[in-house]
From Swiss-Prot:
Mg(2+) binds at residues 486, 492. Belongs to the polyribonucleotide nucleotidyltransferase family. PANTHER family: POLYRIBONUCLEOTIDE NUCLEOTIDYLTRANSFERASE, POLYRIBONUCLEOTIDE NUCLEOTIDYLTRANSFERASE 1, MITOCHONDRIAL. GO terms for cellular component: cytosol. Keywords: Cytoplasm, Magnesium, Metal-binding, Nucleotidyltransferase, RNA-binding, Transferase. It comes from Escherichia coli O1:K1 / APEC. Pfam families: KH_1 (PF00013), PNPase (PF03726), RNase_PH (PF01138), RNase_PH_C (PF03725), S1 (PF00575). It comes from the Bacteria. GO terms for molecular function: 3'-5'-RNA exonuclease activity; magnesium ion binding; polyribonucleotide nucleotidyltransferase activity; RNA binding. This is Polyribonucleotide nucleotidyltransferase. Residues 694-711 have a biased composition (Low complexity). Residues 553-612 form the KH domain. Its EC number is 2.7.7.8. It catalyses: RNA(n+1) + phosphate = RNA(n) + a ribonucleoside 5'-diphosphate.
Amino acid sequence: MLNPIVRKFQYGQHTVTLETGMMARQATAAVMVSMDDTAVFVTVVGQKKAKPGQDFFPLTVNYQERTYAAGRIPGSFFRREGRPSEGETLIARLIDRPIRPLFPEGFVNEVQVIATVVSVNPQVNPDIVAMIGASAALSLSGIPFNGPIGAARVGYINDQYVLNPTQDELKESKLDLVVAGTEAAVLMVESEAELLSEDQMLGAVVFGHEQQQVVIQNINELVKEAGKPRWDWQPEPVNEALNARVAALAEARLSDAYRITDKQERYAQVDVIKSETIATLLAEDETLDENELGEILHAIEKNVVRSRVLAGEPRIDGREKDMIRGLDVRTGVLPRTHGSALFTRGETQALVTATLGTARDAQVLDELMGERTDTFLFHYNFPPYSVGETGMVGSPKRREIGHGRLAKRGVLAVMPDMDKFPYTVRVVSEITESNGSSSMASVCGASLALMDAGVPIKAAVAGIAMGLVKEGDNYVVLSDILGDEDHLGDMDFKVAGSRDGISALQMDIKIEGITKEIMQVALNQAKGARLHILGVMEQAINAPRGDISEFAPRIHTIKINPDKIKDVIGKGGSVIRALTEETGTTIEIEDDGTVKIAATDGEKAKHAIRRIEEITAEIEVGRVYNGKVTRIVDFGAFVAIGGGKEGLVHISQIADKRVEKVTDYLQMGQEVPVKVLEVDRQGRIRLSIKEATEQSQPAAAPEAPAAEQGE
């Protein structure tokens, strides 16, 4: 009854298996893709009819990791998977970005792609497997889709590109780049790098695109065997007469409106033109569809902007193709934060802060393969006021998570190692104004805020967004694109890096035919823009501050004998708890005996270090210590010395005369000098008050109270 169709092929060092026809047969298409024991089950369901009045393409991509895939039970209270993690959201975006441009213009039927990780090999990341699965399932489904696509991860180890490196190999790699594309063209790139050159990055993109052809070939073969008939879908016929009428009413006016350089003023004028045009046309013919008129007007807008750029005319805001908008760079703008910066580029502005914390502030991530600790956090917030709108304010949306991750990639390469700078660092970027490339403004602001906070980053980094307008063989690459140029252009190309090289590259390409030469021009133009921005940033702050903020915790590190860790922690954590309360510091102890004391007050930190040194000091036989009585028993008293170690003063060692009752001579909490007589093999300490007193003042042995002497 079940008759699966299977294809196997070698992909780099891994074997990939595509299997369909076995499971989820009520879905439009379903594929199980495995790559060396990492298996992802991908389904596609498409609605045969579009919803009435639908004016956008409702594509949803869900990526979900099941902990059973790694042989684990979820660590949450309910012991089941909950809302998507940040990692799952990012991979869902990674799948969505290269497939979305391949659906035909005008196709508005609902399509849902669900990728479920069902088995995982710790060495093989499921993201590439899920992307291959989505491509295969869409190609098999019969839904209008101009695929398939291939996907590849590229590493750079020992000056060599490596296809689909394992997790262990990635630790040695200077590059982690994911590239996806069709047989003819690259569609998406997502990467982080350790400051590689433009040529090295471009080489990785080309290498990945060449290597993924084997994936496309095998999906095509699978479609020949198991593909469903292609849907008989046709785009709505173009109403040439209506298009001409709308153009006659609006094209010249829109062309004039797009010469207004101020964004808000321009948007207001464009809205007036659109509403007046639609009102005029509806007055002429009430049967016209308002949504259709809106789409025609949008197409005219797009054509106006693109044709002007291709003709070499100034851009929307009057700039030439390679000009950067005006920059305003300020640091130390918030008095009590550990580091802050306000970075403004034209009508895009980011208020960025850096906060320093201890290892205890690190984020513990419960991932598929277990827990992982992240000591560098980057959060990006995009409130509705940044574009002059009202809207919901709440948990971050997919876009905010994606932009935050891109900005983090841009800064990661220059962050100091934990052994040199043992702080957890959190950067928050608040986008206060937006008109294009707010994620790259976040990179610039983060670099400034980190230097303002005294974080010893290896170099300043800046980011820039590039755009492309292409018709036939004629193309123009635009530097520092506006929001409108992003929407109306053919490519969104973001590059972050230092003067020495690229730290992050993200590309989203909406058309086929972007050649290596075009990408080379864009990368070189982006380098010039990046260096210009870095020059302006360096005028505001050219190196990390020599000291961290007075409001930031200072971490002091000392080393103790690992055998003494238990003494510092105490029974059930009693000693370390008392220490933190007594000194007002945060104390963390590692297994190798490294102790980190964090405090905003230097004197408190010194006090904590002194107390820890007392606790861990070796007790010297024959030495006199100041002690405190902690317990009184019939046969003597226990006295704490040397940072809390208890020793016994036997009743015979309290005074140089016979003592009947210990409480006649000693009270709880009393401070007394004691001499160490012996430390036995089990670490038990024998003390004497009598000998300590004799050693310091021969005639000053403790005496019974006067009232008792008279009896």
